[in-house]
Amino acid sequence: MTKTLDQLLFLYYNKNDKVRITDLHQGIVWGTNTDATDRDPRLTNRFDYDGDYGTVLNRFLMQAAIGYPLTVHGTGGQTRAFIHIRDSVRCVQLALENPP
């Protein structure tokens, strides 16, 4: 619902105020390193893990790393788009370099 409302508000501001808007829907971002963070280990992004509510990919990675069976909640029929952090950063960079 909120993404739909966002789109309607963006359309409104574009038509009424001539605001140029780029809205990026990238899915779930995974990974911890980018070219910038590779320059210094103190810049590495956090790897958040939450057994119940965290990103399924992070949960699966943690469970696999410790030899724990992968836990699937619900029916297992959920689908989500995943994008690596390097690709996400590149997407934002391209959007900034090519405004509407």
Task: Walk through the language-model features, giving the residues of each.
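Intrinsically disordered, low-complexity segments enriched in polar/charged residues with Gly/Pro
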Residues: N16, D48-D50, P69
